[in-house]
């Protein structure tokens, strides 16, 4: 499974990438903001992990763009962010985020959230 990891922090991208590798995923492409994420998003990407707050284009705007395209509308999306209040989680879900991880997190939490998204999507198919 190929992942797209979008975060403006190189350190955070490294943490997410290393966590993905620790739980068995090795095909990963990275981007520093939502606009870059959309540029590198191609049909080989099967799962998106994004931050919320980023310059140029934030995570929610990128999610809305992904959801608005028939080619990518059903792509699984996980948001990894420091925003943890209920209204933020609701707003992310309304934009089309499938699940939500609050920073900091462990590789195990990331794995559980990814598996949860994939199970829900499999059940909906």
PLM-predicted stretches and their roles:
Residues 30-47:
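Acidic, metal-coordinating helix/loop segments flanking the phosphotransfer/catalytic sites
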Residues 83-84:
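Short, conserved "switch-loop" micro-motifs in signal-transduction and mechanochemical regulators
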């Amino acid at each position: 499974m190929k992942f797209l990891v979008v975060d403006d922090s190189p350190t955070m991208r490294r943490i997410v990438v290393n966590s993905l590798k620790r739980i068995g995923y090795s095909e990963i492409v990275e981007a520093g903001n939502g606009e870059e994420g959309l540029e590198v998003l191609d049909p080989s990407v099967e799962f998106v992990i994004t931050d919320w707050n980023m310059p140029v284009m934030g995570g929610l705007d990128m999610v809305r763009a992904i959801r608005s395209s028939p080619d990518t509308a059903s792509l699984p999306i996980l948001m990894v962010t420091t925003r943890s209040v209920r209204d933020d989680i609701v707003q992310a879900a309304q934009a089309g985020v499938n699940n939500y991880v609050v920073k900091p997190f462990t590789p195990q939490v990331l794995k559980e959230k990814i598996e949860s998204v994939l199970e829900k999507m499999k059940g909906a198919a």
